[in-house]
Regions:
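Sec-dependent N-terminal signal peptides
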Residues: 6-9
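Positively charged n-region of N-terminal signal peptides that target proteins for export
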Residues: 1-4
Length: 141
């Protein structure tokens, strides 16, 4: 029984590791905000080397009350931030989270973050896979 349980656990771990290894996160950064700012934004490039789409559904960070997926776009001549339930990273493709496009919005920072600080994130995908990311706080990209 113990051997079967161990085999099952190793098999499950290998599936998670395989799913996680098809996604790469590059150039993760958080824009430094003015003192007493109640909202911050994060950017990064998500690269999917897998044969199927990867769907980002949730992001968490201990540095913020919560993290939201957003997309900036112009609607009827007015720039707006639109909440996204998910961000699809196509198979063998990439999505850049950048100013004026997809990005992470983070309200309620736990403390003031300044250039040189680092912020930890956990990205969760629709298949249950997670990826840990550490982003640098910068004044400019």
């Amino acid at each position: 029984m113990k051997r079967s349980l161990l085999t099952l656990m190793l098999w499950a771990w290998s599936l998670c590791a395989a799913a996680d290894s098809t996604l790469r996160v590059e150039n993760a950064w958080v824009r430094e905000a003015p003192p007493k700012a109640h909202m911050m934004a994060a950017y990064m490039t998500l690269k999917n080397t897998g044969s199927g789409d990867a769907v980002l559904t949730q992001v968490e960070s201990p540095a913020f009350g919560h993290v939201m997926l957003h997309k900036s776009q112009v609607v009827d001549g007015v720039a707006r931030m639109i909440h996204q339930d998910e961000i699809v990273i196509p198979a063998q493709g990439a999505v850049e989270l950048k100013p004026g496009s997809f990005h992470l919005m983070m309200p309620a920072p736990e403390k003031r973050l300044v250039e040189g600080d680092r912020v930890d994130f956990i990205l969760t995908f629709s298949d249950g896979a997670t990826t840990r990311v550490q982003a640098d706080v910068r004044k400019k990209p």
